[in-house]
From Swiss-Prot:
GO terms for cellular component: extracellular region. Residues 32-51 are annotated as: Last Cys-1 repeat. It is found in: Secreted. Keywords: Repeat, Secreted. Used by the larvae to construct a supramolecular structure, the larval tube. This is Balbiani ring protein 2. Residues 1-31 are annotated as: Last constant region. Residues 52-162 are annotated as: Unique region.
Amino acid sequence: CDDAMRKTESDKCTNIGGKFDPSTCKCTPETVTEGPTTCLESSESDEVTTKKPCDCTCAPDCKRRKMIIDVLLKYFYRDVYDKDCCKKNCDCDGAKFPECEESNSKQSGMFDILAKLFKPQGGDFEAGSVEVDGKKLTSEKKEKFGKALQDAVKGLEDILNS
């Protein structure tokens, strides 16, 4: 199984929608079902890399994305997910998620707030102990931030649905 063969077999395997194992040069036909251990990996297009953070359906608490979040991530991908939760749960069926590794983006600031404001269910927003550069946000600011975020999400949803 040399590199040339790997490439050929891998391409063939991709065409039939299988999963290629480079160590054995074998192709396993893969049926993608929305089962309890389905994981979505990052997809790349020419224009934009869309990172799908920790979207293992076997770890529902970590699911912090729906279509609208995808749109935001396309343009502003940073740590918009719970990294610890991600590390613990992003190994469904051995799938590896590069997004779950430590990233080199700043640990605080806008995306830190986003990560803490997004709740997995229902598009509600919750700001617990949100800190920006070591300073806690006042409840008034949290409320304003949540409102601005909801308006933005609503606006984006309207565009997507139009």
